[in-house]
Structures are given as structure tokens and as C-alpha cells.
């Protein structure tokens, strides 16, 4: 590789032509071309400085120690973080290269206990968010499609990664890994010294496979930015005075986690003076958006499971009941937010007037319950009915349902 390959990479990243770079740097295009190809034995320091200044590069260029970490990060865990933190403190610049292969990644998901498959952007986001304050870390995605899965296919993979690093201008001095068996392979195929970090897992005994098989068992090893992805969501539905809010609070207490309150009630107080008489069609999208924000907050800080008081189907049902039509924005959120467990409470508990309820008759309550069921089925949402009439039995039944759901990963 030429000693000026980094300049070629910088020019490519700028998106400039050689003529534009030459003009801006006070040299001819021919001189620049010869310079980039190391044909000029003693290039002008003044021209080099102008070129570096135009490209936003340091001059004179200081020799940097470059490190690289390879991984799938499927998912990112604290073992990865320990490796990366150790590596980035030993080099001037650390490149994290995340490999992805749609076929392989799909197979890993299907053989796991994960409730959803992480996308490539999900995995990149975990890395970017976790290391966003460390300016010497660079993150890349490398397509490994068609390459034999690890630990096979070293020849094909090494040729691919060499080409990828050359395109990105990455010239590593060191590779960091916790996999003892990989060190000689890296040296043989890439010719780069490898530094082993905690290969015996004495400090951080965890692997991506363990988390994929049982996320909740290894919850403490899942980073803060990754945990929301694994959180299970439980939505409690029902008509007015069915005990949803109290039940959600009790469940969140017993499972030591977060809950999302029904935003519609807060909206009525903050925007309508505490009286639904002023509610109109144009309010429903705002109510749905506010509820989505409550849900996102609850999921972000949840301990394995988050409980949701009322879903968007219920919001849509009220819109249809009072306004005679459905709202497209609410429907979009119905499609976007799918919960792991939906519990529909039967309307067979005493109706309590609280100033915000208007469907108190047995006929109204039954009609609304039927509307909920109809809309859940229309949207292909699976749900479990809880028909116990006393509050304690309802609570115990819901605890049982949640434990069954969580038991898949315990």
C-alpha cells in the first residue's frame, strides 16, 4: 500500500475530483496524481500542508496506533463492551467492524428465545449509542453474505475484510479479541498482531449465544441501550371501570418494573379542562401520540417487562364510538405497536363514576366490550380474556399469564 493511500481515501470521502483538490491545494492535477501514487520522492511541504488543510487532515501527520474489533454483536453484551473499552484505551483509533449476513442472522434468531429479530440498524444503533462519547471509536457494518459462517471460511472472509478495510482506509496495527482460537488465524490470513482480552472470561463470563438462548437469565449482562429491545410488553384492555389502571399498577409493583398510564386521561385534564365534553376527532391523534411516548418511556426503563394501561385499539374504539369513524393516525400506531401479551378484562366488575366515564349502563358496557373484541380481531391481535369477577382473582390470573409469557426465557 502507498504511504499516501489515506489521502486517496480522504479525497473519495470528500466527493471531490482530483482537479478540484489540486486547484484548492495550489498544485497541478498531474503533480497531485504523482504525489498520491508515491512518484514524487521529495514532495513540497507547503503543498502537502495545503492538501491536508483542504481535506481536514492533521499535518504533519502523526503516526497513530490503529486497532480493530470484529464481531456480530448479536446482541451487544457487556463482554463486548469490556473488550472494546480495553482496546480503545490502548490505541489512538479503534474501528469496530460489525459483520452481518441476512441468512445466518435469520438462522440465529430462529434458533433463539428472542421474541423479535434485531435488524442491522438495531445492532449499529446499540454500538453507536453505547460508544457515542468516545471519539476515537469508529463503527462500520460489513456484509458477510455468501461467506461460510464462523469459524469456517477464513480465506474468503479475510479477502473480503481486506478489501473492505482498504476501501475505508483502515490500516490496523492490532486486532483485539477474546477468542483464543482466532489469534493465529488473524495472523495467518491478515498478518496483523492480535491482542487477547480476557480469553478465559474471568472478568465477564458471557456470550451472545447465552443471551440469545435466555435473555432474562442473563439480564445483567445486557447493556442499557440494548435492554429495551428485549423487554416484553403486556397491554391491559377493557371498558370503563374494568379495573385496568389499578391492575397495571399492581402488576408493575409485583414485577418491580415500569408501567405506562393511560395518556387519554392526562390529556383530558391538561387540554380539555378535565371534561370530555370538549373532546373532538382532532384530539385522537394527539392522545395516541402521547400514549406512544408513555409506552416508549416505560419500555426504555423496564425491568424485563412493561405494563401498558390501554392500547391503541381502545383509543380507536372510543374514536369510533364517539366520532362515528376511525382515525388513520391511530390505526398507524395500532399497526406499529404490537404487544407480547394482550389481556382483555371482562366488564363484570362494579362501575364506578369518576367524572370521566360515560358508559355506565350494562348495555353500553357490553356494546363497547363487543366493539373492542371486534376491532382486536379485525387487526389480527391475539388476546386473552380474563373473566374473573373479583379483583383479587383477576390480579392472580394476570400474574399467572405474565409468568407463563416470561417463562419462555426463564
UniProtKB/Swiss-Prot annotation:
Pfam families: AAA_28, HTH_3
Regulation: Feed-back regulated by NAD. A high level of NAD causes NadR to lose enzymatic activity and repress several NAD synthetic genes; conversely, a low NAD level activates the assimilatory enzymatic activities and leads to derepression of biosynthetic genes.
Annotated spans, Ribosylnicotinamide kinase: 230-410
SMART domains: HTH_XRE
GO biological-process terms attached to the record: cellular response to metal ion; NAD biosynthetic process; protein homotetramerization; response to alkaline pH
Top EC class of this enzyme: transferase
Binding site for NAD(+) 1: 70-73, 77, 104, 144-157, 177-179, 204-206
Chemical reaction(s) catalysed: beta-nicotinamide D-ribonucleotide + ATP + H(+) = diphosphate + NAD(+); beta-nicotinamide D-riboside + ATP = beta-nicotinamide D-ribonucleotide + ADP + H(+)
Residue ranges occupied by any HTH cro/C1-type domain in the UniProt entry: 7-62
Function: This enzyme has three activities: DNA binding, nicotinamide mononucleotide (NMN) adenylyltransferase and ribosylnicotinamide (RN) kinase. The DNA-binding domain binds to the nadB operator sequence in an NAD- and ATP-dependent manner. As NAD levels increase within the cell, the affinity of NadR for the nadB operator regions of nadA, nadB, and pncB increases, repressing the transcription of these genes. The RN kinase activity catalyzes the phosphorylation of RN to form nicotinamide ribonucleotide.
Name this protein carries in UniProt: Trifunctional NAD biosynthesis/regulator protein NadR
